[in-house]
Amino acid sequence: MNIAVIGLSHKTAPVEVREKLSLPETEIQNAISELCSGTYTQEVGILSTCNRLEIYVVTNEMQPGIREVTQFLSESSKIPLNQLRPHLFMLLHEDSIMHLMRVASGLDSLVLGEGQILAQVKQTHKLGQKYKGIGRILNRLFKQAVTAGKRVRTETSIGTGAVSVSSAAVELAQMKLEDLSNYQVAIVGAGKMSKLLVQHLLAKGANKISIINRSVGRAQDLANSFKDANIKVYSMLEMVQVIGESDLVFTSTAATELILDKAKLETILDPLKPLMLVDISVPRNIGNDVSELPNVRCFNVDDLKAVVAQNRESRRQMAMEAEVLLEEEVEAFDVWWKSLETVPTINSLRQKIETIREQELEKALSRLGSEFAEKHQEVIEALTRGIVNKILHDPMVQLRAQQDIEARRHAMETLQLLFNLESEMSSGKVI
């Protein structure tokens, strides 16, 4: 079996490409089902965020397995493979393992050290299990990656004062507008990113904030979490009017289609009044053509790179601390991965010993008589099972823990010879 990751991110593809490959949670089940129906793909985990789509697979044949994934990506995005391929990255086994560890730790994020990605990796693991895409190998890998992410955030300084896409968006606005307290601000959307936007806007001095959302109740809940801020709430039906009265607008919704374009705005905007739009959604919420309107400036997530660059250098040294921890977690996974080679031998030995135990127990109970056997069978059963487990425990632990490949294989061959396991394994009795 081989592990691989195929995908694209803010490092390899512009937002125009990434948005075509953004998979909302509602589509993950079908995507996993389609990929798992392939001939060469045994396990699948799909990580989809605003800055990346990564498909982790366990495949029995590497090249055909990768081909199945790239074909799926091309068909899903409706981008011909020859045009999509330059934006894709592919990492195999050790490289794919380290990559997921770095992703979970925030070291591969647009905003170095951001914390939201760890929750997104956890959700990928959860959905992969729910929809039967993640099996034994990816289950262990994602658990190890989550452990790595937690360790990096608690044992290093990378998480201290870490910024997010939302905070970078507010920073960009402040760079362009300076004193945010002078501006009327609107936020379209009421999710986690919007909550962070409000938090950072208030910290920067903004005091005239409106939230626009499809569910007014959800927008009100968000406003209520900042009780002293006097935040106004509007429905999507009022969106265009509110934007027309605003100086700065952020969009952060899960909409898969554009919610703002030139046609919607040109009739309500004052051509003499400047308007700054910051779209942190993927797929994008705002069409490119709004920039054709007089006095309108529009930015998207790719425009945050300049802001992030200022923060990145000071955090690069912190990231080096984290890499040491990640090496430890990769090694821990690798030890487990290599131990899988011992599973057939261990299962075969356990099956053989269990068969002997059951046979000898049956003989003993028949000699003791039915009355005694019925009364004490459970105790004797537990006793014999306990003895077997105790005897097998240390040899099995030592066999799994043996990291030297030659030594481990020699130990397996010795066990197979001493217990005549070859015939057991070849006869299909292994469980």
UniProtKB/Swiss-Prot annotation:
Q: Does the keyword NADP belong to this entry?
A: yes
Q: Which GO terms describe its biological process?
A: chlorophyll biosynthetic process; protoporphyrinogen IX biosynthetic process
Entry's EC annotation: 1.2.1.70
Active-site residues (renumbered)? 50
The portions of this protein that span the membrane are: none
Keywords annotated in UniProt: Chlorophyll biosynthesis, NADP, Oxidoreductase, Porphyrin biosynthesis
Task: Site Important for activity: list residues.
Answer: 99
Q: What is known of its domains?
A: Possesses an unusual extended V-shaped dimeric structure with each monomer consisting of three distinct domains arranged along a curved 'spinal' alpha-helix. The N-terminal catalytic domain specifically recognizes the glutamate moiety of the substrate. The second domain is the NADPH-binding domain, and the third C-terminal domain is responsible for dimerization.
Q: Which family does it belong to?
A: Belongs to the glutamyl-tRNA reductase family.
Q: PANTHER family in the record, alphabetically?
A: GLUTAMYL-TRNA REDUCTASE 1, CHLOROPLASTIC
- Descriptive protein name: Glutamyl-tRNA reductase
Q: What's the source species for this entry?
A: Trichodesmium erythraeum (strain IMS101)
Gene name tied to this protein:
hemA
